[in-house]
UniProtKB/Swiss-Prot annotation:
Family to which the UniProt record says this protein belongs: Belongs to the immunoglobulin superfamily. CEA family.
Reported tissue expression: Mostly expressed in the small and large intestine and at lower levels also in other organs.
Localization of this protein: Membrane
Glycan attachment residues as annotated in the record: N69, N95, N110
Organism, scientific name: Mus musculus (Mouse)
Protein's recorded name: Cell adhesion molecule CEACAM18
Length: 376
């Protein structure tokens, strides 16, 4: 790994390789050894030198600073189950676990060096030595973006992680991302591009992981994404239907427009084609007059997205009731007498015409048959 400190000297690398080979030999022969994975620590973090191949009948664990077990180099001694004794090299940050591992809290760079453990059993004494390297983490990465004020579906943002590390990860809204059809990460991992930003893109952050399980994150970049309006809803009191609001003269009428938009949109009201000086999303007509009847339009405008929507409503008075139709027939008395006389006279006239017609028909015939009223 590439740490922000001088690299290991060649002899230390050789020592580390020798330690790994020795550990392999010890593991094969059943000897104790210090786990190679625990021989790398990080400044200001806890370091645990893990002891492997520990026998079961341990009487005492003794840890020393250096390659020998001299008394002045002893850090800590632990006799299971509860007897613990600090030594001359104890700094107040060390302890020994029940498994015999050495724990160093708040590791410092000067903790780097050889460590030796001595394990006493009823039959023998085993010893293991390892080189501990405490590294100093590089500073947290920086982050920059070409812009933080964007329009949804139109703009893209390019963010760069300012670091020399090669192990970089990106977080959008605190969630790790590895790229998608909307997001692109450069091959070196240092650049993230979000194409066609969304209203749900709020924060950007990058992180490096030079040491396993230690994540160093950059500061957050807050994105401001303008969006909307998607639509406009219109609420009225009294309620309207099919774009028509029916209200009586002198009654109170309320109109209110609502929409989802960022930033807050501008509102305009138009009455019968004329702009009203009402910049709010609602208006009230406390006492409706004839002059206030007609069409109203609520216009919603987002200056950032340059989107404009509107809704219309027409205020009109109730329709007058239809005239009542009297279905009863009334005829005055004189008219009744007149109609009776007219009917009688008309009937007599019709009978006279019929008799006359019959008489004429009989008298014109070439062969006269006897008429019903003629006798022998």
């Amino acid at each position: 790994m590439d740490f922000s400190r001088p690299s290991f000297s060649p002899w230390r690398w050789l020592t580390l390789v020798a330690s790994l080979l020795t550990c392999g030999i010890c593991q094969a022969s059943g000897q104790i050894f210090i786990s190679p994975d625990s021989l790398l620590g990080v400044e200001k973090y806890r370091t645990i030198l893990t002891l492997e191949n520990v026998p079961e009948d341990v009487l005492e664990y003794s840890w020393y600073r250096g390659k020998d077990n001299s008394t002045e180099n002893m850090i800590f001694s632990y006799k299971p189950p509860n007897t613990r004794h600090p030594g001359p090299s104890y700094s107040g940050r060390e302890n020994v676990t029940r498994a015999g591992s050495l724990v160093v809290r708040m590791s410092a760079v000067n903790d780097t060096g050889y460590y030796t453990v001595e394990v006493d059993t009823s039959n023998e004494t085993q010893r293991a030595t390892g080189w501990l390297q405490i590294v100093k983490l590089r500073s947290n990465p920086g982050i920059s973006a070409n812009t933080s004020a964007l329009v949804e579906g139109m703009d893209s943002v390019v963010a760069k992680c300012l670091t020399n590390s090669s192990n970089i990860s990106w977080y959008v809204n605190f969630v790790p991302t590895s790229g998608s059809n909307r997001m692109t990460i450069s091959p070196d991992g240092k650049t993230l591009i979000i194409h066609r930003v969304s209203r749900y893109d709020h924060t950007l952050q990058c992180a490096i992981e030079d040491v396993p399980e230690i994540l160093q994150k950059s500061e957050l970049i807050q994105l401001t994404v303008a969006y909307g309006p998607d639509y406009v809803s219109l609420w009225t009191q009294p309620y309207f239907f099919a774009g028509v609001l029916t209200a009586d003269i002198g009654s109170s009428v309320q109109l209110e427009c609502n929409c989802f938009s960022k930033p807050e949109p501008r509102y305009h009201w138009i009455h019968n084609g004329s702009f009203l000086s009402i910049p709010e999303n609602n208006m009230t007509l406390p006492s409706l007059s004839w002059e206030q009847m007609g069409s109203y339009r609520c216009v919603v405008e987002n200056p950032e997205t340059q989107l404009t929507f509107y809704r219309d409503v027409t205020i009109q008075p109730p329709r007058p009731p239809l005239p009542t139709v009297n279905r009863e027939l009334y005829i005055p008395g004189p008219l009744v007498i007149f109609l009776i006389l007219l009917t009688s006279l008309g009937g007599a006239f019709v009978c006279r015409v019929l008799v006359y017609s019959l008489f004429q028909s009989c008298s014109r015939g070439k062969t006269c048959h006897k008429c019903p009223w003629q006798t022998n």
